[in-house]
Amino acid sequence: KTTPYALDFVTDRDGVFDDVLQETMLTAFKAGEHKVRAQVSSLVPKGLNKAKIEKIGNVDIEKGGATWLLPRVKDDACFLNVLKQMSTRLADLGYSVSTGQLVWNRFKSQLRTTKGKNSYPLVWAESITSAGFRFSADRKNHVPYIDITPQQGFLVTKSECVLVQRTTSKEQDRRILAAILPQGFIDETGGVVVENHINIVYSNGLFSAVRPDVIDMLLNSHVVDRAFRCISGSVAVSAYELNSIPLPSLEQVMEIQSLIDAGVHRRIIERTIAGFYGVMIA
């Protein structure tokens, strides 16, 4: 039995491994169980044989298979203390996460450039933008439609939900890029097919008080993006990680919903969400 003792994040992704961009963390374990807080540092490569080590802080590592919350910068130390007190997750708000059902290269014969009788819009990750949902299939190998047989109804999404890109990098301004798939677009087209590089955050029917636009606002907030960066260690934005993000309490989420209903400016709502995480923003 061992316990994490030290964790070093390698700041560079380029040049660590040949011909690949790979985020790397070096972890040292100590035999046995101990109560010493693990030391987290960043390791900045300085050529082939040298590196600068910058201490970030000491943290308690979650036990029992729970998600590790690790600071990426010094300012995250206090932030993590708040995160660890936040017990609400997407499931507590009545939402589940699944991966887009369509692996496109398994259905090549059904892809269409024009809409036919049995066609549905095929939603790619490029349709999720910082300005919201914008149906698009402009990138290489992307087409806008797919024919669906009567036996493939499971591929079709017919209810409003929040779509999240499954692949982003730490260099991007936002690791979580989400957009509402509007019910109006679904009703107009009869449904859509969501490609596999997208996560679908949908109401599971167990609790319906929180609307999708509120979940969208939360996931796109700067402070939730910061929390996600303390969880994620790769370019993948997995369903497991989305389900692990600490979120405000139900009462606080309903307060956010009330602010949206009142037409309050997004900047004020961002400030309110940040406050729930103990973060002050201008």
Language-model-detected regions and their locations in the chain:
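Polybasic, glycine- and aromatic-enriched phosphate-binding surface used to engage nucleic acids
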Residues: 76-258, 262, 266-281
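Signature of N6-adenine DNA methyltransferases within the class I
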Residues: 1-96
